[in-house]
Amino acid sequence: MRLPRQSPYEILLLVLVALLVLLLLLTSKSPPSCSAPERSKEPEDNPGWATGHPRTHPARCRANLSVSSHPDFAGLPLHVRDFLFYRHCRDFPVLREPRVTKCAEPVFLLLAIKSSPANYGRRQMLRTTWARERRVRGAPLRRLFLVGSDRDPQQARKYNRLLELEAQKYGDILQWDFHDSFFNLTLKQVLFLEWQLTYCTNASFVLNGDDDVFAHTDNMVTYLQDHDPDQHLFVGHLIQNVGPIRVPWSKYFIPALVMAEDRYPPYCGGGGFLLSRFTVAALRRAARVLPMFPIDDVFLGMCLQQQGLAPGTHSGVRTAGVFPPSPRVSSFDPCFYRDLLLVHRFLPFEMLLMWDALNQPQLLCGRQSPAY
């Protein structure tokens, strides 16, 4: 018995039905795919020292190419153009965080120290001198290094491994995946303000400073114990009646495309300043609405102004260094530093010498010979 011959149209229809069934089977077994945001190529960190809070990896921020249409843009230095391209970017992955115990108990003074990835020697010196975590007259001090990533990928791999080892041993590294540079110091400040809101709100006061300052933290505690952390406090080396530098070769060059005004608000030099938790919250509110400005200490002055607050001065903060009364007197005499709060700047070995000298019970000042 012969089977009826099928027409070409029937065969084509059967093939199409079979393909449709196969496609339905395949799609039912695997979920639909979606594009994932770009992430740092860093390996997952050891959960032994991570905070335990789930972390999202933000999508990589894209350049705002529209700024390049400005007629003055092409003539700007490369780092200024780079800043303008990415001025709007504020969300970067966290590579490393401190241990959960960092702020588990109330902190009287949080030492938030800006450091570059390569500055291992400075960080080590601070850990053993003025930034050592301890209690001063019952007030707990905690330490935090704020770090970005090296611009060069090969160097970044080495430094990031170094920072990972430091984080595992000391639990004091807070690192983000952005290029650590002078013009990104403001970004570092803004990210720290947001991090503090989530992970260290119980810090009464903050020392915000560089890793090459000498801070007399014992004197800072004495000074701060007379202040209310829930009142405005922002003190350092006050700078006022100055404006943007328009000379392109200057490190502090600010073209009119970045800031058209010719006057900065009052601010404290970025080498180091003290602030209360009240003022930390005020800075955070302002930083969320103000456009980024590349010089971090000026930006914080802008934030204070936006909140109707003013920076204050303290004679014990010397971000321009110490100047002796006579050229025959050494500026490194510890007697000049005994009653100060902070001096900028110090080499690591000078940090150790000064810390040791100031902690000598036999240190005598006045007519006696200087220690150095």
Curated annotation (Swiss-Prot):
Name the enzyme's class: transferase
GO MF annotations in UniProt: beta-1,3-galactosyl-O-glycosyl-glycoprotein beta-1,3-N-acetylglucosaminyltransferase activity; N-acetyllactosaminide beta-1,3-N-acetylglucosaminyltransferase activity
Known EC number: 2.4.1.149, 2.4.1.146
Topology in membrane: Single-pass type II membrane protein
List the record's Gene Ontology CC terms alphabetically.
Golgi membrane
Instruction: Give the reaction(s) catalysed.
Output: a 3-O-{beta-D-galactosyl-(1->3)-[N-acetyl-beta-D-glucosaminyl-(1->6)]-N-acetyl-alpha-D-galactosaminyl}-L-threonyl-[protein] + UDP-N-acetyl-alpha-D-glucosamine = 3-O-{beta-D-GlcNAc-(1->3)-beta-D-Gal-(1->3)-[beta-D-GlcNAc-(1->6)]-alpha-D-GalNAc}-L-threonyl-[protein] + UDP + H(+); 3-O-{beta-D-galactosyl-(1->3)-[N-acetyl-beta-D-glucosaminyl-(1->6)]-N-acetyl-alpha-D-galactosaminyl}-L-seryl-[protein] + UDP-N-acetyl-alpha-D-glucosamine = 3-O-{beta-D-GlcNAc-(1->3)-beta-D-Gal-(1->3)-[beta-D-GlcNAc-(1->6)]-alpha-D-GalNAc}-L-seryl-[protein] + UDP + H(+); a beta-D-galactosyl-(1->4)-N-acetyl-beta-D-glucosaminyl derivative + UDP-N-acetyl-alpha-D-glucosamine = an N-acetyl-beta-D-glucosaminyl-(1->3)-beta-D-galactosyl-(1->4)-N-acetyl-beta-D-glucosaminyl derivative + UDP + H(+)
InterPro entries reported for this sequence: Glyco_trans_31 (IPR002659)
- Any single Pfam family the record assigns to this protein: Galactosyl_T
Lumenal side stretches = 32-372
**Chain spans, region Disordered:** 31-56
Supply the name of the protein: N-acetyllactosaminide beta-1,3-N-acetylglucosaminyltransferase 3
Q: Which organism is it from?
A: Mus musculus (Mouse)
